Structures are given as structure tokens and as C-alpha cells.
Amino acid sequence: MKRILVLGMALLLTAVAFAQNNVTRFMGIPIDGTKSAMIQKLKAKGFTYNANEDELSGEFNGKDVYIRVVTNRNKVYRIFVSDAVGSTEGNIKVNFNRLCRQFAQNDKYIPQNVFGEYEIGDDEDISYEMSVHNKRYQAAYYQISEADKDTTGFTQWAIEKAMAKYTEEEMQNLTEQEVQHFKIELLMDYMNEKMSHKSVWFMITERFGRYYIYIFYDNELNHANGEDL
């Protein structure tokens, strides 16, 4: 039991707990509510709405972009951001890697991949890989906020998970390598349980020989979950 408690406390120092009533935000705006209300809030941020195309345009993160508001059952669940101007293959790699570094250095995000390794190598032929192997270049993160940093109950959660997997004797006999592996496993489980509804991810897409980055700010709590089936 002592080792389980120590493990729980060690994880407590590095983990972040997430309240379920918090939702993903785009430029500080909660991704929730009606589409019309969201459009008005984005217009207040300086974006211009085109009713014919049902999209907004403006500048975001130093680039000209188009923005679409996506809903499910009249509730916003996604903000979709697209480059307004396409790039060459070489430039899109630079842009993608720069975006990866910006997310990595921003304390509002943690990578969904525990290692956070998303950048594209200099020698990567993305045109070939995408067209021949259907390779997808994507990076995904969980969004956090100061309000999320509530570790209440985390130690008990970690203890219950540990006791469900190991007996006290087995826990005492784990090697340090096994303990470290289990800590990573617990952290990933915790992130999936507490953060998966606050996903921000981006990918490269190709259209007519030009490359674009799509960014998705998702509130999975409002996403379709088969209720209409």
C-alpha cells in the first residue's frame, strides 16, 4: 500500500485534472452555444462573415484564414480553421513544424501522443507519402486552462487504478522500469478520461497541387454520439 500511495503522490505532482464542465476554447471563446451566437462573437474578434459561403475570414496566428462553425443539434462542437492561401510542399513542412513547436511551447496544451513527436523530417517527401501511401500528417493536443488545474481526488483515482491492476505484493515487486511504464500508462488513461473532450488538432491537406493546414478546435461533449441512429 505504501508504494501505491507513493506512486499516486508522484503522479499528482505531474498530472493535471480536468473538470468536465470546461470546454475547448477558440481565441478565448467557449466552443458551445448556437451557431449564430458564435458567429457574432467571432465577428467581435475582427473576422468578417460571408453569408453566401457561410464562413468567416480574417487573420489568425499571423496567417489569412477561413473559419467555419460546425454544429450538432444546433450546438457548436467544432471551429474549423483553414489556410486561405495554399503553400508549396517545402513551405507547408516549415509551417507545420512551426505550428508543432508553437503548441509544444504553449502551456495551454499537452500532446495527445505522450512523446509529442509530430514534426516532419527535412528529408520527408510528403507529396509521395500522401499520394502513394495515403499518409496523414497530423498533430493532436489536449487544451487546458487554469481552471482545469484541480488535482482533487487524483491520488485516490491513481490508487484505485493501481489496486485494480496489481496486488500489494505485486506492486512491491515491480522493477523501477515497470513502475515508470505504469506511471506513463496511468497518465495516458487519466488524460483520455478527463481531457479527451477538449481536443485541438491540425493536419496537412492537398488540393490541386497546393498544400493547406486545417486546424480543428473540438468540443467532443457536443459531438454526435449516435443519438440520431
Where are these predicted regions, by residue range?
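Sec-dependent N-terminal signal peptides
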Residues: 4-17
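Non-cytosolic coordination micro-motifs
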Residues: 20-51, 85-229
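N-terminal, post-signal-peptide region of Sec/Tat-exported proteins
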Residues: 42-82
